[in-house]
């Protein structure tokens, strides 16, 4: 019987890909920071609405990456954030402060959750459930 090498991939009970998450961390941070900035600029000046579309695309891509590394709860939140930004863009002539606040909270929550997962090396989907369900409510989708 041999011991696993120190170079072997660390697998947890949930089987998410922790080494890949470590590698993706800087890109995830940039994506979330940009989304936050685009939302803020749109909040200050609705003529900046096209910036939201950049974040719609990048958050949709992030969602797919999170699914690929088996971080399903991150996928759900990033996907909901993308849909929320799309709704804000589509309804830019009708300000929706509740949706803006919920998307902002979701961006912040996802950033903190990624840090939590990296630090604790485990997942805790229940931490994301309240904001995912709030965004689903804003989007007229069923909760999880």
Protein language model features and the residues they cover:
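Structural secondary-structure packing elements that flank or coincide with functional cores
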Residues: 1-18, 91-144
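Extended amphipathic alpha-helical scaffold segments
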Residues: 2-6, 29-39, 63, 73-86, ...
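Long, amphipathic alpha-helical coiled-coil segments characteristic
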Residues: 12-57
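Secondary-structure edge/capping motif, primarily at the C-terminal ends of alpha-helices
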Residues: 35-46, 66-69, 85-95, 117, ...
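Solvent-exposed, non-transmembrane amphipathic alpha-helical segments
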Residues: 48, 59, 82, 86, ...
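Short, well-ordered alpha-helical segments
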Residues: 51-55, 69-84, 98-106
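Beta-strand-dominated lipid-handling architectures at cellular/organellar boundaries
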Residues: 56, 63-65
């Amino acid at each position: 019987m041999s011991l696993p090498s120190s170079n072997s991939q660390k697998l947890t009970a949930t089987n998410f890909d922790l080494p890949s998450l470590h590698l993706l961390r800087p890109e995830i941070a940039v994506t979330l920071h940009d989304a936050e900035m685009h939302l803020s600029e749109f909040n200050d000046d609705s003529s900046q609405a096209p910036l939201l579309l950049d974040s719609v695309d990048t958050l949709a891509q992030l969602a797919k990456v999170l699914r690929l590394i088996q971080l399903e709860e991150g996928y759900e939140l990033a996907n909901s954030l993308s849909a929320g930004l799309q709704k804000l863009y589509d309804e830019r002539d009708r300000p929706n402060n509740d949706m803006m606040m919920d998307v902002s909270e979701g961006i912040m929550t996802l950033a903190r959750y990624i840090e939590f997962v990296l630090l604790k090396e485990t997942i805790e989907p229940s931490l994301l459930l309240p904001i995912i369900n709030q965004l689903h409510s804003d989007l007229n989708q069923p909760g999880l």
